[in-house]
């Protein structure tokens, strides 16, 4: 998706126009439309590239920065082999990229024995496993890295009959 912005004198968004909406491309150049391509997470890297996390067949792809984003093939990002053991629809749910390029990946339902959920901090080919414990009955929906190293995690809780709760949790960088 791309569009041009109209901003006011204080740089506040007033309108969007000249929208272009098209499917993202797979590593083969085909549009990503198949149910096995369940894009769940999106983060922008310091170099302007976009990183997309997928469930079902768990993987992360990096797309080049604009203006090439819409027309380029993604490059697979290395992830720990253990991610493939995540539940089909409970894998990579939140991705955040820090200013130094490290990538944080949190899972939605890939549980540890203590009830926390698996996550990883990656730097190139190095993976550091970590645990994330959401608020009671909540699950990770997405996350974002802040410039000073903290992370904001968006959590959601869904109860049948349409009751949805969401919350933001601040995770300090030193934890």
Q: What residue spans do the PLM features occupy?
A:
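Sequence/structural signature of beta-propeller domains
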Residues: 1-175
């Amino acid at each position: 998706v791309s569009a041009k912005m109209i901003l006011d004198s204080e740089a506040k968004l007033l309108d969007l126009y000249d929208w272009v909406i098209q499917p993202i491309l797979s590593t083969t150049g085909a549009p990503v439309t198949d149910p096995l391509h369940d894009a769940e997470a999106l983060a922008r890297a310091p170099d302007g590239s976009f990183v997309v996390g997928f469930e079902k067949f768990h993987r992360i792809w990096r797309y080049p920065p604009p203006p090439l984003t819409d027309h380029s093939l993604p490059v697979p990002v290395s992830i720990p082999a253990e991610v493939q053991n995540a539940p089909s629809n409970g894998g990579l749910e939140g991705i955040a990229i820090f200013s130094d390029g490290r990538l944080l990946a949190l899972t939605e339902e890939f549980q540890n024995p203590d009830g926390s959920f698996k996550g990883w901090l990656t730097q190139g080919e190095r993976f550091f496993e970590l645990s994330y414990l959401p608020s009671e009955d909540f699950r990770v929906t997405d996350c974002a890295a802040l410039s000073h190293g903290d992370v904001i995690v968006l959590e959601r809780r869904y109860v049948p009959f349409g009751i949805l709760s969401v919350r933001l949790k601040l995770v300090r960088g030193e934890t």
